[in-house]
């Protein structure tokens, strides 16, 4: 069994990571830039762990959804993480709980040397594409936050009442409160693994005319859960990571109805909205979508540039050395 998350997301504040829980146990940190085989190594670790009967969590790259940024085996408290920018990670206690493997150790520098200027230029372009994406996402987020403030006044009572009703109906237990990214803004647009990961659980779909209303409801519900020391996993908004747009409490998942493949229960959040406010919100939504589309285009350009860098590094790699490192990492997992 596997669950899929993101290590972070491209947000209004730049890249925002959420993976501190992966470094609590035995942690393998991979170093090496583009084209060095980090993702392929993690896919192999994940495949072998699954074949051995372990449940795994895989963490995708928000700029390339097909690529792995981390793999975690919860029952072994064992993680392999891509420790390079923008999610730089270091070993807290080297060779005890943290193990660093640099996949570039045996690379042939002579094969890379002729392309140094090309690499520097490509890296500079890639950074600019991401900066442009974050600028557009910041503009989109300002619109979203302004809409949320406007809707808060109209929906505050309905949201508070619905959150209290949901809280009262849940089976609660005390424990850890954790956060994850289960959706992200990527080179493919908005990618969401929520429905894939929680099949078989009781699902509550929240229906509202505007997504801001659902976020207000989730915020109210999380406040009640936290005040009562209830265990939950909250899922960060891929655009505005200080806020949350879905939550799992025990065996119940609560999210926007459009994100769920099936719903066992539906909550409708409704309140009167004036024609003037509706007109303002619709115009703002169109502008918000324009900024998000521009951000996705920038992320896609950054990804294409990254592919170009990969093509330079990959032929210089010593893949026998990478395979040997993979075997050592598997020994750390299986205590051999």
What do the PLM-derived regions correspond to, one by one?
Residues 1-19, 157-196:
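N-terminal pre-Walker A segment at the start of P-loop NTPase domains
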Residues 30-31, 41, 57-60, 139, ...:
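A cross-family "folded-core" feature that marks the main globular domain of proteins
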Residues 1-53:
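Generic N-terminal leader/targeting and pre-domain segments
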Residues 1-12, 47-111, 117-118, 223-297:
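Conserved nucleotide-sensing/catalytic segment adjacent to the nucleotide-binding pocket
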Residues 27-46, 188, 199-225:
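Glycine-rich phosphate-binding P-loop
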Residues 195-196, 318, 334-336:
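SAM-dependent transferase fold signal centered on methyltransferase-like domains
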């Amino acid at each position: 069994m596997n669950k899929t998350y993101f290590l972070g997301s491209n947000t209004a504040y730049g890249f925002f990571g959420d993976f501190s829980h992966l470094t609590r146990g035995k942690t393998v940190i991979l170093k090496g830039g583009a084209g060095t085989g980090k993702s392929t190594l993690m896919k192999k670790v994940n495949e072998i762990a699954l074949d051995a009967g372990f449940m795994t969590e895989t963490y995708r790259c928000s700029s390339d959804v097909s690529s792995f940024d981390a793999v975690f085996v919860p029952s072994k408290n064992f993680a392999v993480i891509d420790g390079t920018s923008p999610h730089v990670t270091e070993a807290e206690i080297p060779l005890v709980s943290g193990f660093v493997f640099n996949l570039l150790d045996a690379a042939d520098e002579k094969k890379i040397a002729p392309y140094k200027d090309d690499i520097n230029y490509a890296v500079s372009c890639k950074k600019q594409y991401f900066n442009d994406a974050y600028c557009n996402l910041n503009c989109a987020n300002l619109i979203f936050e302004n809409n949320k403030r406007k809707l808060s006044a109209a929906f505050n009572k309905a949201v508070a009442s619905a959150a209290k009703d949901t809280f009262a109906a849940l089976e609660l237990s005390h424990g850890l409160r954790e956060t994850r990214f289960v959706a992200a803004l990527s080179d493919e647009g908005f990618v969401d693994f929520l429905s894939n990961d929680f099949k078989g659980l009781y699902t509550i779909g929240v229906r509202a005319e505007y997504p801001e209303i659902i976020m207000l409801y989730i915020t109210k519900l999380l406040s009640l859960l936290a005040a009562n020391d209830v265990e939950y996993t909250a899922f960060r908004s891929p655009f505005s990571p200080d806020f949350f747009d879905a939550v799992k409490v025990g065996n119940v998942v609560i999210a926007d109805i459009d994100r769920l493949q099936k719903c066992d229960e539906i909550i409708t959040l409704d309140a009167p909205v004036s024609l003037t406010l509706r007109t303002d919100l619709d115009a703002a939504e169109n502008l918000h979508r324009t900024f998000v589309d521009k951000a996705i285009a920038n992320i896609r350009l950054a990804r294409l540039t990254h592919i170009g860098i990969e093509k330079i590094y990959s032929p210089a790699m010593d893949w026998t050395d990478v395979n040997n490192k993979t075997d050592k990492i598997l020994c750390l997992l299986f205590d051999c």
